[in-house]
């Protein structure tokens, strides 16, 4: 193998359990976003646009959809003999293999992959954030400061700082303290989960961490604190662009809505920084004589005979005559029946919603079964569910994937209820 100055390791094994039914059958990085993409496309495209041509994608939870999406890396120009994209799954490691025990352990298990390229630097990325970033500028900053590790940070609202790993720094950006989700933060500089390490330094710490049976084998909890404690040169690289952890239903919905605001906070139309993804083989979208679309993203293959307002539609969505979709996300190949009204909902892939359905109505009461997941007024329908004609569905309702019309307990699903596979409602 030819030596590489820098390679990327993209951590894409997370379940994303806070996304509820959206990640019941796929990993969080494979979740659809923005009418066209999957979340992982942003980190992969950042690599391409930053001239990083060697990427190892570390998968674990429900990897099939992700593996199929990435393939040999052609959409990102990573179908290469030397370098390119490689899927690194723990279950490929014969009888001695084991599941990744943490983010640091995931990298430790793939030391041999990194060593093949003898890089001077390794950039560790998370596959479940939405942002556009030039990693080569971060690498320049790392070199200028003779750093052992550089951590990309972003200012978050003070009231949210306790949800993140927080970096406390000197004025010049050198890190003197790291606090994981502090109750009383001293800074609002949050880690973005983007790290550049000198590879030989990181490898030493990964090997030592693996030998510590009490370690959680996590970058934030173990590797970074250990390096700081031992006086390694660690620097914070401040990022000023758009960055979102779309790890909750509300954050995911809000980030999609950001794309269709009057002046989009996150611009996907920048020709200088393209986001690449496999393109569906579908015709252009069609708006019929009874159709209307306002302030929405409508992808290829959609057929619109109803009204779509302030919404994001993925490829192949069919909106029947008289139907109305407002403030909603409708994923690929779903069908919305005649005279159906959809308000502030997330509809999964290949869902069939019947005629005369009203969804997202009533009181905004947190979901009874999972109030910590469904509490922002958004109703979520899992993939390939079938919603029967005439159904009235409230807010913060969750409908399991693959539910059939016959499994609905009634045609009136009140706010805060859950319709579970098997016909139960809670």
UniProtKB/Swiss-Prot annotation:
Which residues does alpha-D-glucose 1-phosphate bind? 100, 165, 180-181, 191
Disulfide-bonded cysteine pairs: these are none
NCBIfam families named in the record: glgC (TIGR02091), PRK05293.1 (NF003670)
Give the protein name, as stated in the record. Glucose-1-phosphate adenylyltransferase
According to its UniProt record, which protein family does this protein belong to? Answer: Belongs to the bacterial/plant glucose-1-phosphate adenylyltransferase family.
Which gene name does the record give?
glgC
Does the keyword section mention Isomerase? no
Query: If you read the UniProt record, what top EC class would you report for this enzyme, in one word?
Result: transferase
In which pathway does this enzyme or protein participate?
Answer: Glycan biosynthesis; glycogen biosynthesis
Assembly state and interactors?
Homotetramer.
One protein family per Pfam: NTP_transferase
């Amino acid at each position: 193998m030819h030596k590489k100055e820098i390679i990327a390791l993209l951590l894409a094994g997370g379940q994303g359990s806070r996304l509820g039914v959206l990640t019941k059958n796929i990993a969080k990085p494979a979740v659809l976003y923005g009418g066209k993409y999957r979340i992982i496309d942003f980190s992969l495209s950042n690599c391409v646009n930053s001239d990083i041509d060697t990427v190892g994608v570390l998968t674990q939870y429900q990897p099939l959809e992700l593996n199929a999406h990435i393939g040999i890396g052609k959409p990102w120009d990573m179908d290469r003999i030397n370098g390119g994209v490689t899927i690194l799954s723990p279950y490929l490691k014969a009888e001695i293999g084991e599941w990744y025990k943490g983010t640091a352990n995931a990298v430790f298990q793939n030391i041999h992959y990194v060593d093949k390229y003898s890089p001077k630097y390794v950039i560790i990325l998370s596959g479940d954030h939405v942002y556009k970033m030039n990693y080569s500028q971060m690498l320049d900053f790392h070199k200028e400061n003779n750093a052992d590790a550089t951590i990309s940070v972003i200012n978050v609202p003070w009231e949210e700082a306790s949800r993140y790993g927080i970096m406390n720094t000197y004025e010049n950006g050198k890190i003197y303290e790291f606090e994981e989700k502090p109750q009383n933060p001293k800074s609002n500089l949050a880690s973005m989960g983007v790290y550049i390490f000198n590879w030989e330094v990181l490898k030493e710490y990964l090997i030592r961490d693996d030998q510590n049976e009490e370690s959680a084998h996590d970058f934030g909890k173990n590797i970074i604190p250990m390096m700081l404690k031992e006086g390694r040169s660690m620097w914070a690289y401040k990022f000023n662009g758009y960055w979102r952890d779309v790890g909750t239903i509300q954050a995911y919905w809000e980030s999609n809505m950001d794309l269709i605001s009057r002046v989009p906070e996150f611009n996907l139309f920048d020709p200088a920084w393209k986001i690449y993804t496999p393109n569906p083989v579908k015709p252009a979208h069609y708006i019929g004589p009874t159709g209307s679309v306002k302030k929405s993203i409508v992808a290829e293959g959609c057929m619109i005979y109803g009204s779509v307002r302030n919404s994001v539609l993925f490829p192949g969505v069919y909106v029947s005559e008289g139907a109305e979709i407002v403030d909603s996300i409708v994923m690929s190949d779903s069908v919305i029946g005649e005279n159906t009204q959809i308000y502030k909902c997330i509809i999964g892939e290949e869902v069939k919603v019947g005629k005369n359905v009203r969804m997202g109505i009533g009181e905004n009461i947190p979901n009874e079964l999972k109030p910590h997941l469904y509490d922002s007024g958004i109703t979520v329908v899992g993939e390939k569910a079938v919603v029967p004609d005439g159904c009235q569905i409230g807010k913060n309702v969750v409908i399991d994937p693959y539910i059939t019309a016959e499994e609905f307990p009634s045609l009136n699903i009140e706010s805060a209820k859950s319709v579970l596979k098997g016909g139960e409602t809670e």
